[in-house]
Amino acid sequence: MYPEELCMPMREDLTSVGFVEMRDPEDVAEILDKKEGTVLVMVNSVCGCAAANARPAAKISTNHSKRPDVFATVFAGQDIGATAKAREYMHPYPPSSPSIALFKDGNLVHFIERHHIEGRPAEMIAENLIQAFNSYC
């Protein structure tokens, strides 16, 4: 685990635009067990592709007119229990951080894995999310 003071700005990068932090398994269950509505979950990370690509893309997507009911985040490598619980909902995809998942009515409907984030500009990833929002939100 990294020191919390190192991770705080990475957390705030998302919470400052309305993402709800899920810090423990109970937080995850409270949000993802709901069977109505849409939820975007960003699996945050300290890696460079989270900073350069995933978080900026997630932030850009919050400005779209058609959007999920809830934007939420877990922090891989920091909030171990919450991340493990969130990943239970992301099957059949293997653990991936960063990653971005969209749920509708309790079902996983769209997933962006790390290998779809690395090397792609934030705008391209955001467009992928926006297309998913247009389809599911």
Model-inferred region functions:
Residues P94-C137:
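Non-catalytic, surface beta->alpha helical segment in thiol-disulfide oxidoreductase systems
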Residues T83-S97:
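Short acidic (Asp/Glu) patches
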